[in-house]
Amino acid sequence: MTTTTTAADFRHALRVRATSAAVREAVTTEQGVSGWWFPTTAVGVDRLHVRMGDSGLELRVRAEGDDVVWDVLDCPVEPDWVGTRVRFAARPDGEGGTALAFTHHGLAALPCLEVCTAGWSWYLPSLASYAETGAGAPGPRPR
C-alpha cells in the first residue's frame, strides 16, 4: 500500500484480492459504496447520494475508459470537495487480484488535506475488504 500527494492530487495504491469487476461494483453501485464507505442511495442512472451524518454529498459516477470517476457535484459536509474528481483505476494484477490506483484530484490543494488523507487511508482498505469478502468497515471512522 502506497500513499503520495502531489501539488494537487492525493494518490493511494493497493492490491485487492478480488477481481477488477468486484472493485468496479464496489465503487459504482448503491450497495457497493454503502458496504465500505457511507450509506448511499442511487439517484437516477449516474448519480449517487452518500449520507455522512446529517449531511452528505452528490456524486456523478462515470466511466473513463476502464476507470471509474466520481465527479463531486455537491458536498455540504466538505464544501471544498465540490469540483474535485475521484478516480478508481482497477487493473488485473496477473495473480487473480487487482491493482487499484486511487486518485482524488484536487484534494492536496485543500485545507482538509490532513483529515481527508486520514479518511481515505482508512476507507480504501475498507473498500478492499468489501471487494474481497463482501464486508467492509463503513460509517464514521474511529478517531
Label the predicted regions:
Residues 24-27, 36-37, 70-72, 117-120:
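Tryptophan-centric aromatic hotspots in well-structured domains and transmembrane helices
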Residues 34-43, 48-101, 105:
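Hydrophobic-ligand binding "helix-grip"
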